[in-house]
């Protein structure tokens, strides 16, 4: 599988990861319905109740609201992104156990406050393994209606 992201969307995700450092950030990947073409991202609050340097949690009510917002624009949630402060962009055992198999999971490694390696993962139905997903970066510009056009 391939997930496609606009360059600006990836830059927004990296900026979010850097601003949250040394804690993990989290957010949603928004795409056209039934598509892996990510046209936007939505920052989410890290609602994890413990130390946030190696964990994140998205509040289910906030996820529901974001899903409704995306649907009102004819879009859908294609996945989740989060950062790994001072740790590789791998998908941890905790990440696997708490993932939703239909989503792509973009992980950004942030080293000393600077976003770097970014990888995408697809968990399997049994929550015991993941496959790496290819990331294709598109040079696109966003439109106000949520549709992206290639530059």
Region spans (language model):
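Conserved beta-strand-loop surface patch within small alpha/beta domains used
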Residues: 1-77, 86-151
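Short, well-ordered beta-to-alpha junction loops that form the rim of enzyme active sites
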Residues: 83
């Amino acid at each position: 599988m391939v997930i496609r992201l606009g360059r600006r969307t990836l830059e927004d995700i990296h900026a979010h990861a850097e601003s949250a450092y040394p804690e993990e950030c989290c957010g949603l990947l928004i795409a056209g319905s039934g598509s892996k073409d990510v046209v936007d991202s939505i920052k989410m609050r890290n609602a994890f109740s413990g130390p946030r340097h190696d964990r994140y949690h998205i509040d289910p009510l906030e996820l529901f609201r974001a899903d409704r917002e995306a649907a009102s624009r004819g879009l859908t949630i294609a996945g989740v992104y989060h950062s790994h402060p001072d740790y590789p962009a791998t998908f941890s055992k905790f990440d696997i156990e708490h993932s939703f198999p239909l989503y792509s999971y973009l992980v950004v490694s942030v080293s000393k406050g600077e976003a770097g390696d970014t990888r995408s993962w697809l968990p399997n139905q049994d929550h015991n393994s993941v496959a790496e997903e290819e990331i294709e970066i598109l040079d696109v510009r966003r439109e106000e209606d949520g549709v992206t056009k290639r530059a």
